[in-house]
Amino acid sequence: MNAFTRDDFVTWMEQLARRPWPMTLDAFTDLAPELGWHFTGYQYSFTADFAAGTRKVVVIDNKAGDVHTISFVLAKPALEGVELLAELNDFFSSYVAAASETWGPPIRTVQGRNPVAAWALPQACIAEITRNEEKIHAKFLTPQGARFY
């Protein structure tokens, strides 16, 4: 799976932050084709055509029906062992640097085996990345999701 470039990560988070939140899941489903995203027919599941390739995107709503979280994989190298971890660490560091250059220092970081970094975005949104042993995952929280962060 091709990885997002650091600039593509920032661009997508900013593009999502500029959407007119709050927005219901139904309204988001109608808007998704403008982003190059397509509803799969399964609850919360979209496919997205990013520069890095097609990805599954999960869009979750709250009890009121408003979207609160959008998540997708940024990088999942086809490597193993030490090479995989080194590649993931390089990508993670690159995403952290790009986000920090754009939005300032992270509002939250977690060090260790599964590091996390999160930034405050315009319109009271949050961008978060998490690295585990296989991939780097991006999470965008709308204002409806960010208020519980």
Features from the language model and the residues they span:
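Short helix/turn-capping signatures at newly exposed starts of structured segments
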Residues: 1-113, 120-126, 130-149
